[in-house]
């Protein structure tokens, strides 16, 4: 969100809420360690109307002196968690990486208690292990803590937010940690197999949009051919972004799709994409073309082009 003040951050959250967004994703490290506190202030304004995801696994960066909130606070989502509240949400841009946690029960308990305090709530809706890998899940007491925290009403559910390959390894060996799985997915990725986990996807656009747009602009013949097949001008950045976002929604129709924005107009536009059924057919066709004509190896090149 650039160099935003606390007031500006709260204002963009209020704008997102006005558009129907009522689930917010955050982490202790976001906003140089201040994002949970700001989100907590916002949540307190709307008691019983907002749900929250936060995480344990990457500590906040340690900075001396006063630090203004210079990043987004939470990622907008365009689907809601079944059984919680229907809605869309906003999400925080990351601060600098402050290292990785030990993924022990004692450390996790301290992190959870801090998050509950910062968020000014007695219960966190979704609590994720942040960037955890299979090798990190060595402490059986950590799983017990998460299960006991659900039973105690401190969290509603839990899971892992990590890379897709790490999620797949955990699902194969330690599925008990994965009631919820959060990972990146865009039209450049293969379809996700059916899983028992509730899925949260992110990065449908960002560098994936920039890379694909650049490739299409450099290959005018393909851009023209695909535009005709899709029925939309793919040289238009708004059209391309809308179809990429819609395809990501269609890939995870019962889950959550996260996106970040510092612009209330962009948030409004993304909400409109979620509600526009006429985009479904062209979005599916775009995804089919990418999967048929861009190999997995080349998809990495498309991302790199961004």
What positions do the PLM features span?
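Active-site mouth loops of central-metabolism enzymes
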Residues: 1-7, 94-109
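Conserved functional loop/turn residues at catalytic and ligand-binding sites
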Residues: 20, 120, 154
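Short amphipathic alpha-helices and their capping/turn segments at secondary-structure boundaries
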Residues: 36-48, 111-118, 193-196
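Non-cysteine beta-strand/loop elements that form the S-adenosyl-L-methionine
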Residues: 51-55, 77-87, 200-207
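Alpha-helical membrane-targeting segments
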Residues: 60-98
């Amino acid at each position: 969100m650039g160099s935003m003040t606390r007031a500006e951050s709260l204002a963009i959250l209020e704008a997102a809420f006005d558009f129907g967004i009522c689930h917010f994703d955050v982490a202790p490290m976001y906003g140089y360690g201040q994002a949970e506190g700001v989100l907590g202030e916002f949540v307190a304004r709307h008691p019983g109307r907002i749900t929250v995801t936060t995480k344990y696994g990457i500590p906040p960066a340690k900075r001396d002196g006063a630090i203004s909130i210079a990043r987004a606070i939470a990622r907008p989502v365009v689907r809601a968690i079944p059984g919680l509240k229907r809605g869309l949400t906003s999400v925080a841009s990351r601060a600098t990486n402050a290292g990785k946690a030990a993924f022990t029960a004692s450390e996790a308990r301290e992190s959870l208690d801090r998050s509950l305090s910062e968020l000014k709530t007695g219960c966190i809706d979704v609590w994720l292990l942040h960037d955890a890998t299979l090798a990190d899940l060595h402490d059986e007491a950590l799983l017990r803590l998460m299960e006991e925290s659900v039973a105690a009403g401190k969290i509603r559910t839990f899971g892992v937010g990590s890379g897709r390959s790490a999620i797949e390894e955990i699902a194969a060996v330690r599925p008990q940690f994965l009631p919820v799985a959060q990972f990146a997915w865009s039209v450049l990725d293969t379809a996700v197999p059916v899983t028992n986990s509730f899925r949260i996807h992110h990065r449908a656009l960002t560098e994936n949009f920039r890379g694909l747009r650049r490739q299409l602009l450099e290959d005018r013949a393909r851009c023209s051919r695909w535009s005709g097949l899709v029925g939309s001008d793919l040289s238009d950045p708004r059209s391309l972004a809308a179809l990429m976002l819609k395809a990501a929604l269609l890939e995870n129709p019962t889950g959550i799709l996260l996106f970040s924005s510092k612009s209330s107009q962009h948030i409004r536009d993304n909400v409109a994409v979620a509600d526009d059924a006429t985009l479904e057919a062209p979005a599916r066709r775009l995804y089919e073309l990418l999967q048929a004509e861009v190999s997995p190896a080349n998809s990495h090149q498309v991302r790199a082009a961004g």
